[in-house]
Design a protein with these regions (language model features):
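Acidic, His/Gly-enriched loop-helix segments that form or flank divalent-metal centers
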Residues: 1-88, 93-116, 121
Length: 123
């Protein structure tokens, strides 16, 4: 049993109660994107924005790490790979402000890094 188990359970319960989508005037934020019916899809990997018609206004998404915050049409992609040692990024759709901070440590390695590490010898 680890020291943070109780706290982790409390946060998990709290996070499980949060909505999958946050909406404001002219924008919506979701983890990964939308399926064909417009429902949030937490695991989508293909670029849904290629077919997005703008019906929700600007869409703020994470899920797929990028070197910097990027915009493509109505889509703002804010995942800058904090879990892999990149920056943690936040975006305010009302002001267009981006806030970034360095994470405290690398928690995981990206799939690309894992493949690269797996093909190189340590000597």
């Amino acid at each position: 049993r680890q020291r943070g188990d109780g706290l982790s359970r409390q946060w998990l319960q709290r996070l499980q109660q949060l909505p999958y989508v946050f909406q404001g005037e002219g924008w919506v934020a979701t983890h990964a994107g939308f399926d064909d019916s417009g429902r949030p899809d937490l695991h989508i990997r293909e670029p849904f924005w290629d077919h997005y018609n703008g019906r929700y206004g600007r869409v703020i998404v994470g899920h797929t790490p990028r070197p910097a915050v990027e915009c493509q049409g109505h889509i703002v992609m804010i995942d800058t790979g904090a879990v892999y040692g990149g920056l943690l990024s936040a975006f305010c759709p009302e002001t267009d402000a981006v806030v970034q901070v360095h994470g405290p440590r690398v928690i995981s390695e990206s799939p690309a890094q894992q493949r690269e590490l797996a093909t190189r010898l340590p000597c």
